[in-house]
Amino acid sequence: MFKHVTVLLKETVDGLDIKPSGTYVDCTLGGGGHSSYLLSQLTDGGKLIAFDQDEIAIQNAKEKFSSYGEQFVTVKSNFRYLSEKLHELGITEVDGILFDLGVSSPQLDTPERGFSYHHDAPLDMRMDQDAPLTAYDVVNSWSYEQLVRIFFQYGEEKFSKQITRKIEAYRENKAIETTGELVELIKEGIPAPARRTGGHPAKRVFQAIRIAVNDELKVFEEALESAIDMVKPGGRVSVITFHSLEDRICKTTFKRNSTTPQLPQGLPIIPDEFKPKLKLITRKPILPSDIELEENNRARSAKLRIAEKR
């Protein structure tokens, strides 16, 4: 069963300021939590298009929301193709779009998917099971310099070089095939005092590899720009991020699109191409409540930002 505790459920959907007959997009269907709450607010004229790369998530949602008929449409695709896929459906603008960038719990909790450092499993980490690049390829084929870069940039791992040296030495003799093998090498690369603080020692490296395998940051940056273009004036974009790299992209993109660039003084009017596209609904991110954190530990790093098309 595809179970997943949805983070910031009401805040994210209510932040879209739902119009009952509007057209909305859930870019990250997952367990269908946000979609379920959103669909419950639509009348017969309303529609929700939901994206996911995971076939299990798609099939589960089709069964779960079958009573909504043509109001609910699934798209098995990476949300980097948001604009393209919506145009294929004959949709040129929408009333709101949401992103929940966390890895869904079923993916984390299914050992054979290779996302979790708590289970021994083949190194995979692909969100899209048909994609060619796996965690095995990254760990065994990428150069010392490439691994150090992603561990440091994507995982913000202080001991990137030490961990990569352990990986290099090990793979000279045999391939690193499982998450368990990789966890042991990560532990060896981190000094004992540092291992005792800051959560699981493999957390940052696993995050970095997952981001690299799925090209997550570039994909999100492209999709967020597409979302801003696809939303009609008065429509909104809600984004939940789970680490500082994603949040920085969201914050920067929203800020750039909501401010007027420096223009020569004395211009009688601001040319249309320089007018801000967005109005910020959240100046500072919305964080989970204490009650939500008690009920769902995975919500602790979540941040929600919302912007409205001008």
From Swiss-Prot:
GO terms for molecular function: rRNA (cytosine-N4-)-methyltransferase activity. GO terms for biological process: rRNA base methylation. Keywords: Cytoplasm, Methyltransferase, rRNA processing, S-adenosyl-L-methionine, Transferase. SUPFAM superfamilies: Putative methyltransferase TM0872, insert domain (SSF81799), S-adenosyl-L-methionine-dependent methyltransferases (SSF53335). It is an enzyme of class 2 (transferase). It is found in: Cytoplasm. GO terms for cellular component: cytoplasm. Transmembrane segments: none annotated. S-adenosyl-L-methionine binds at G32, G33, H34, D52, F79, D100, Q107. It holds the Pfam family Methyltransf_5. Its EC number is 2.1.1.199. It catalyses: cytidine(1402) in 16S rRNA + S-adenosyl-L-methionine = N(4)-methylcytidine(1402) in 16S rRNA + S-adenosyl-L-homocysteine + H(+). Its main location: cytoplasm. Coiled coil: none annotated. Belongs to the methyltransferase superfamily. RsmH family. Specifically methylates the N4 position of cytidine in position 1402 (C1402) of 16S rRNA. This is Ribosomal RNA small subunit methyltransferase H. It comes from Bacillus mycoides (strain KBAB4) (Bacillus weihenstephanensis).
